[in-house]
C-alpha cells in the first residue's frame, strides 16, 4: 500500500467514525451485550454450538446429495428448483419467471443472497419495480445506500436521520418524528405495495432437504406477507443453506437469535413448505380471505452456486460455508463496532466472516479492500454459534493477497527480513516490516540506547511514516541492551529447594524490551519454589502470521517446536507471559505443525498467572507473593487470553493476594499488535481504545494492570501512564 493509499484509507475511516460510528457502536455493542446475557441462560451453550457445527459439516460434505434430495422434495410438492451457476444465470431465470407472470412489481424480504447477485438492478433493467419490504432494507432502498450489517442493514442510521429521509422523500401530511410514527408509516405503505405485487421473493435461513421446507427467522412479519400475497413465490438461497432435515433446525433456532441480536427467540420463526395453498388475506381485514385458495400459485427455489462449490473444495475457505449469517462476529468485533460494514465489508458481506465470502464469491481484490481490519484478536471465534475459526480464514486470505502483491521498495528492508515468503512477490513493505519484528528487536537491543534515540527521533518518525506507514504519533517501546536471557544466564536460578522446574518462554517483547516484567516473572515463580530455565527460542511466529505470512510463521513454529520439544518430552512445563504467544501454542500451531508436535506443546504450555493459580491451588504459599493490602486495581485482560478462558485466573490470584479488582469488559483494546502502529489505522485504533479508556478512568483505581504488550502500549497512550503487567504486582521485590 502506497503512502497515498494509506491516507485515503485513513480519511475514509475517519469519515465513517464521524458520520456513522456512534450509531454503529451503540447498536452492535447492545447486540453483543445481549448475546452474553442470552446465551448465559442456556444449559449447554457449547453443546448446542457443537451440534450445530456437526450438522453443517455433514451438510456441506453431502451437499451434492442434498441438492438432489431437496430438488425431489420441492418438485413432489408442486414447485420448481433451479440451481444457478452464477449471478447472471440466477438473474436470467428470475427474470424469466417475472416475464411469464407479466410482473410489474416484485416484493422482497429476507434475502442477502439476492443482494449478492444484484437481482434488483437486473430486474429494474427489465422494467420490474422491486420493493424491499424489510424495514431496514426499505430505508436503505429509499436512501440509495448499501447495507452496513448482515442482520441490521440500516444499523448506521439514526431515528432522526430516517425521519428526515422519509419527510423529504414522501412529504407526509404531518412530519414524522417518533419511532412509532416511522414504523406505522412504513407498515402502511409497504402493506399497499405488497398487496399489489405480482411476485414475492424471499431468502431462507435454512432449507431442509427432506421436505423442501424453508426456515425464515425474522423480526418482522413481512416475509410471511411476501410469501402469501402474490401468487408467485421465488426463494433465493445459497446452496450452503441446505440442511438434511427439519429436525436439524432445532440447534440453529436456539442459537441464531441469541447470537445475532441477543434475543432468546426472534419475533417470527416461519417454516414454509411451498407452494403455499393458504388463501391470500386482506391486510385491512385479515379474517376475510381475498381468494378461496384455488388460485394459480407457483413456487421457484433458486439455489445459488456462484463460487460456493469451489469454496467447498478449498480446504481453507470451506469453513466459511458453515456460516449461518447471524452477525455475531460483527457485533463482537471492536473494529466493526467503530466503523461498521461500510468499511469492514465488501460487495455484499460484512464483518469478520466477510473475507471468506468475498474471496470465494467476488475474488481476492474485493476481500483485500477490508481484510486488514481483522486483527486476529479472536473474540469472534467465541461468539460464532458454529465455531468457525474466522481469524484463520482472514489470515489465509491475507496470505493469498500477499502472494499477488508486488513488493515495493524491498531494498529498504533487504537483509532485515529473513522471512520465507519468497522473492518477486509477497507482502508489501509495511507487512514485511512488522512481520519480521523479532529481527528488528534484536538489532534494536544490540545497538541500544542509540537505537532508541534514532527510532523516536523526528526524522526517523517522518521517514518510517512516509515509507513504511508507521504512524509517528506512536512512540516505540525502549529496547534494552541486556536481554532477559542474558540477565538470567548471568544471574542463574535463585529458587530455594525448588519443587519443580519450568521453561519461561522469552517472547521478543519480554526478551528485548520489557525485560523488567520478565525479571518479575522469574521472581514470581521462584517465590513459589519453581526453578526457571530460559532457553534460546525464537518468537512464536505471531508477528508474521498477523501479516498473513504463513510460510514464515510455519518455519518459525518448527524452530520453536525443536527448541521446546526436549523440555516438554522430559515432563517440563512451558510458562508464557504474552497471551498471543500462548494462543499460538494452543491454537494456530495445530494448523502449522504435525499433531505429534502440536499436542504435547499445547498440553504443557501455560499462561503465567494461570500457572501461578495452579500452584496456589495445589498448596503453594500465597504469603510469598506481594501483599496488595486492599489496593484497588483496574484489570484489562488481553483479547486472546479471554478467548482461551484464562482471564479469571488473573483476577482470582490478584484477589487472593489482597487486591480489590475491577475488570473491563471491552472486547479489544484496539492496538492489536502492529495494527495501531499503522498510519491508515491509527485513528480507528484510538477510537476503539477510547471505550477501554473510559472504563479505566471510571474505575478510578490505584493501579491499572494489563496482560498483553499491545494492551499496555495502548493504555499508556490513552491514559498517559504505562500500566503494569500482573506479574509486576504479584512478584516480591527483587
List where the protein language model places each region.
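An acidic, phosphate/nucleotide-engaging active-site surface
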Residues: 138-204
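N-terminal leader/transition segments
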Residues: 1-123, 134
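Catalytic cores of enzyme domains
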Residues: 181-352
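Extreme N-terminal leader/targeting regions
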Residues: 1-49, 399-402, 406, 415-449, ...
Amino acid at each position: 500500500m502506497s503512502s497515498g493509499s494509506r491516507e485515503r484509507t485513513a480519511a475514509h475511516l475517519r469519515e465513517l467514525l464521524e458520520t456513522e460510528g456512534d450509531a454503529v457502536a451503540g447498536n452492535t455493542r447492545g447486540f453483543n451485550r445481549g448475546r452474553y446475557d442470552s446465551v448465559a441462560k442456556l444449559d449447554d451453550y457449547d453443546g448446542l454450538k457443537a451440534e450445530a457445527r456437526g450438522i453443517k459439516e455433514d451438510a456441506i460434505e453431502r451437499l451434492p446429495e442434498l441438492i438432489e434430495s431437496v430438488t425431489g422434495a420441492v418438485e413432489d410438492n408442486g414447485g420448481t428448483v433451479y440451481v444457478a451457476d452464477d449471478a447472471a444465470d440466477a438473474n436470467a431465470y428470475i427474470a424469466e419467471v417475472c416475464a411469464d407472470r407479466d410482473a410489474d412489481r416484485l416484493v422482497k424480504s429476507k434475502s442477502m443472497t439476492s443482494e449478492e447477485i444484484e437481482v434488483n438492478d437486473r430486474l429494474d433493467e427489465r422494467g420490474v419495480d422491486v420493493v424491499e419490504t424489510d424495514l431496514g432494507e426499505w430505508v436503505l432502498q429509499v436512501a440509495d445506500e448499501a447495507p452496513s450489517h448482515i442482520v441490521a442493514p440500516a444499523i448506521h442510521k439514526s431515528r432522526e436521520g430516517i425521519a428526515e429521509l422519509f419527510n423529504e422523500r414522501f412529504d407526509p401530511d404531518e412530519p414524522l418524528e417518533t419511532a412509532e410514527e416511522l414504523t406505522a408509516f412504513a407498515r402502511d405503505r409497504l402493506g399497499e405495495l405488497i398487496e399489489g405485487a405480482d411476485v414475492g421473493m424471499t431468502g431462507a435461513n435454512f432449507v431442509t432437504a427432506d421436505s423442501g421446507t424453508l426456515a425464515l427467522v425474522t423480526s418482522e412479519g413481512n416475509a410471511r406477507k411476501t410469501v402469501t400475497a402474490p401468487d408467485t413465490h421465488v426463494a433465493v438461497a445459497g446452496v450452503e443453506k441446505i440442511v438434511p432435515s427439519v429436525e436439524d433446525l432445532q440447534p440453529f433456532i436456539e442459537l441464531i437469535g441469541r447470537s445475532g441480536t441477543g434475543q432468546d427467540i426472534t419475533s417470527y420463526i416461519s417454516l414454509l413448505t411451498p407452494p403455499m395453498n393458504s388463501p391470500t388475506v386482506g391486510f385491512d381485514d385479515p379474517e376475510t380471505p381475498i381468494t378461496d385458495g384455488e388460485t394459480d400459485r407457483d413456487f421457484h427455489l433458486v439455489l445459488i452456486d456462484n463460487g460456493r462449490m469451489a469454496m467447498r473444495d478449498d480446504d481453507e475457505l470451506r469453513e466459511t460455508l458453515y456460516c449461518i449469517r447471524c452477525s455475531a462476529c460483527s457485533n463482537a468485533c471492536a473494529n466493526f463496532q467503530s466503523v461498521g460494514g461500510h468499511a469492514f465489508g465488501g460487495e455484499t458481506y460484512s464483518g469478520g466472516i466477510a473475507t471468506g465470502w468475498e474471496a470465494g464469491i467476488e475474488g481476492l481484490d474485493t476481500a483485500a479492500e477490508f481484510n486488514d481490519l481483522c486483527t486476529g484478536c479472536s473474540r469472534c471465534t467465541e461468539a460464532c454459534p458454529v465455531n468457525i475459526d474466522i481469524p484463520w480464514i482472514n489470515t489465509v486470505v491475507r496470505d493469498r493477497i500477499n502472494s499477488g502483491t508486488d513488493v515495493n521498495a524491498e531494498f529498504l528492508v533487504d537483509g532485515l527480513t529473513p522471512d520465507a515468503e519468497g522473492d518477486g512477490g509477497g507482502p508489501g513493505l509495511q507487512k514485511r516490516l512488522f512481520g519480521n519484528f523479532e529481527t528488528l528487536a534484536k538489532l534494536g537491543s544490540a545497538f541500544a540506547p542509540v537505537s532508541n534515540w534514532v527510532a523516536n527521533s523526528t526524522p526517523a518518525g517522518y521517514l518510517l511514516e512516509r515509507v513504511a506507514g508507521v504512524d509517528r504519533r506512536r512512540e516505540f517501546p525502549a529496547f534494552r541492551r541486556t536481554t532477559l536471557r542474558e540477565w538470567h544466564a548471568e544471574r542463574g536460578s535463585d529458587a530455594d529447594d525448588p519443587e519443580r522446574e519450568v521453561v519461561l518462554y522469552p517472547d521478543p517483547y519480554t526478551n528485548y524490551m520489557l525485560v523488567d516484567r520478565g525479571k518479575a516473572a522469574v521472581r514470581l515463580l521462584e517465590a513459589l519454589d519453581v526453578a526457571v530455565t530460559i532457553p534460546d527460542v525464537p518468537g512464536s511466529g505471531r508477528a508474521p502470521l498477523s501479516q498473513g505470512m504463513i510460510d514464515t510463521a510455519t518455519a518459525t513454529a518448527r524452530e520453536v517446536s525443536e527448541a521446546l520439544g526436549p523440555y516438554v518430552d522430559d515432563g517440563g512445563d512451558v510458562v508464557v507471559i504474552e497471551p498471543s504467544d500462548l494462543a499460538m501454542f494452543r491454537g494456530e500451531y495445530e494448523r502449522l505443525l504435525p499433531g505429534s508436535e502440536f499436542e504435547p506443546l499445547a498440553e504443557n504450555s501455560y499462561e503465567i498467572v494461570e500457572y501461578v493459580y495452579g500452584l496456589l491451588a495445589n498448596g503453594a504459599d500465597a504469603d510469598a507473593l506481594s501483599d496488595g493490602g486492599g489496593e484497588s486495581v483496574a484489570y484489562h485482560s488481553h483479547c486472546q487470553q479471554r478467548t482461551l478462558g484464562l482471564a479469571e485466573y488473573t483476577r482470582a490470584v490478584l484477589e487472593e493476594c489482597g487486591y480489590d479488582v475491577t475488570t473491563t469488559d471491552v472486547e479489544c483494546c484496539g492496538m492489536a499488535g502492529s495494527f495501531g502502529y499503522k498510519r491508515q489505522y491509527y485513528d480507528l485504533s484510538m477510537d476503539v481504545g477510547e471505550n477501554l479508556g473510559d472504563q479505566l478512568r471510571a474505575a478510578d483505581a490505584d493501579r491499572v494492570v494489563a496482560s498483553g504488550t499491545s494492551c499496555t502500549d495502548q493504555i499508556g497512550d490513552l491514559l498517559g501512564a504505562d500500566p503494569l503487567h500482573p506479574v509486576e504486582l504479584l512478584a516480591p521485590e527483587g
